[in-house]
């Protein structure tokens, strides 16, 4: 009889378990190299932004359109003079453009973090290391 109670209790316990795990939404970082294209085609990219430790560096293509090897070959010493401090918190990007100007935009990631959309700004950037189109 005692074994029956243990079995019933075990069954009741196992059946009453509910998987209520709330998985957090994926977190994507803004850190890294991102290319911008004036068209919807990433192959037309002529500008790259690199976000590193709160500083945004800007690079322009010399022989456009630049391919992945070209963009990957650039180092911070190749960036245009002047940098922009930035903060990325709660899906909001704030870039200090200096002289009292600031870019504040909501960021939405797609393609497993390989593409980002800016709310009302230059629209989209592609992460350099992604295969997103």
Regions found by a protein language model. Name each.
Residues 18, 35, 52, 126:
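Residue-level detector of conserved, well-ordered beta-strand and adjacent loop positions
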Residues 19-35, 132-133:
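N-terminal helix-cap/turn-to-beta initiation motif at the start of protein domains
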Residues 2-8:
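Sec-dependent signal peptide recognition
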Residues 46-53:
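Broad, structure-driven detector of short, well-ordered beta-strand segments within folded domains
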């Amino acid at each position: 009889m005692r074994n029956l109670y243990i079995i019933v209790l075990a069954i009741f316990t196992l059946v009453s378990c509910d998987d209520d795990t709330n998985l957090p939404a994926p977190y994507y970082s803004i850190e890294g190299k991102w290319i911008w294209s004036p068209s919807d085609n990433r192959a037309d990219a002529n500008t790259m932004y690199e976000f590193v430790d709160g500083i945004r560096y800007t690079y322009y293509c010399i022989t456009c359109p630049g391919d992945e090897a070209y963009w990957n070959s650039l180092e911070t010493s190749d960036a245009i003079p002047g940098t922009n401090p930035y903060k990325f918190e709660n899906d909001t990007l704030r870039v200090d453009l200096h002289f009292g100007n600031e870019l504040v935009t909501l960021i939405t990631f797609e393609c497993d973090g390989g593409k980002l959309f800016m709310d009302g700004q230059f629209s989209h950037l592609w992460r350099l290391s992604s295969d997103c189109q």
